[in-house]
Amino acid sequence: MRICGIETEYGCLIESERVAREFSPDTLSILVKDHLFYANDIGLLDAQYRDRGEPPRNGGFLYNGGRLYIDMGHVEYASPECLSLRDLIAYEKAADFLLLQALEDLGIRDDVTFVRNNIDHVTGATFGYHENYLVSRDVPFEYYMVPALMPFLVTRQIYAGAGRVGFHEEDPYDEDDRRRRRVATRVTDEVPYQIAQRSDHIVADQYEWVQ
């Protein structure tokens, strides 16, 4: 039997000028998180530092076994470990419901939208939907794992990806371009839609980083 889980990062879109004058997406994300923990009592906030970027009360464990927290200004949700894909989808939908309920409680459901997101249109960064595969350290990663996983990770964009409207106009290979942050998302007849959201951002077949 295998366990599975999912991690989702939510972008905050403020569609109302009235709300935008009072809140930024970052502060609104914190407001929603605090409302869920304090008013709706969905779980227990962390009492201690978990990391340099995760101070006390930045987030916490939910009573359903998952976690909800603020990561670099946006709401992030991690499901509990699940034994079936049906349960996994149910827990992911539960996160959507929690955010909608908070917006409803705060009276801003028609003014604010939380969307599952893995592209930052301001900085050009890509993130989210991390996956973990438990294997022995004795397994040669580059010789076994990469050849086995790479075709799956690439082709699943076709049948399981959400796609993307438009394209990103930053050259990831151009250091001067990146420093200038010449970032824009455009929709044109030339590139109206892409199958994969991250195609404009990924420049390496694999990247290894230990935190």
Predicted regions mapped to residue ranges:
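Terminal catalytic/cofactor-binding subdomain
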Residues: M1-R116, P147-V165, A184-H201, D205-Q211
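Histidine-centered divalent-metal-coordination microenvironment in nucleic-acid enzymes
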Residues: N118-S136
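Hydrophobic, small-residue-rich alpha-helical packing segments that form membrane-like cores
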Residues: S136, A162, G166-D174, R180
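Acidic/His-rich structured neighborhood in mature extracellular/periplasmic domains
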Residues: N132, V139, A148
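Short coil/turn motifs at secondary-structure junctions
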Residues: E15, S136-D138
